[in-house]
Design a protein with these regions (language model features):
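N-terminal amphipathic alpha-helix/helix-capping segment at the start of soluble metabolic enzymes
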Residues: 1-16, 23, 130
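Active-site mouth loops of central-metabolism enzymes
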Residues: 13-29, 74-86, 141-157
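Conserved, mostly hydrophobic/aromatic
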Residues: 17, 45, 95, 165, ...
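Alpha-helix-loop-beta-strand connector modules within alpha/beta enzyme cores
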Residues: 53-77, 120-143
Length: 174
């Protein structure tokens, strides 16, 4: 189910957010936790994405567990600050294969570690949203900052970037 269908009702929705494990050995335990949380019947469950790749390998797998095993709508986070376009395309393909249609597209934090190589292929989340939209029929969410993004010089600049997200295909903001 597309998240916009859930969010466009007058019902109050409660969701859960999962942080994937850093090591694959913990994955089975996390899948059990997903089942336990699904028993609470949240409207949807979101699965975060490790900005520096620390936990990103298990985002799609846990989102699959949410959607296809526990039958709860899944919202997979996808960040691009430290990703290549090829990596993003690969994740998008995995999401399509698992029929995970809800994606929260985020630029993500820029790693402060000078040893971490940054591909610098995405400057803004709007570019990621455009790539996701062009590669499939996804329900895409984006982040907004009522107080203004810390990197924006003005609220007007922040609103311009917010409009760019919507123009690129963002369907809901959080």
């Amino acid at each position: 189910m597309r998240l916009t269908e859930l969010l466009n009702t007058e019902n109050v929705t409660i969701s859960c957010e999962l942080f994937p494990p850093k090591q694959g050995a913990q994955l089975d335990n996390y899948k059990k936790i997903v089942g336990d949380m699904a028993a609470l019947k949240p409207a949807y469950m979101s699965v975060t994405y490790g900005a520096t790749g620390g936990t990103s390998d298990y985002t799609v797998e846990l989102a699959n567990e949410v959607r296809n095993v526990n039958h709860i709508p899944a919202l997979a986070h996808l960040t691009c600050a430290s990703s290549t376009k090829e990596k993003v395309a690969s994740v998008i393909q995995e999401l399509k294969e698992k029929q995970i249609e809800n994606v929260l597209a985020l630029r993500g934090d820029i790693p402060q570690n000078a040893d971490f190589p940054l591909p610098n292929q995405y400057k803004h989340a709007s570019e990621l949203i455009y790539d996701i939209k062009s590669q499939g029929d996804f329900c895409i969410g984006g982040a907004c900052y009522p107080e203004g993004h810390p990197e924006s010089q003005t609220l007007e600049e922040d609103l311009i970037h917010l409009k760019e997200k919507v123009d690129a295909g963002c369907e809901f903001l959080t």
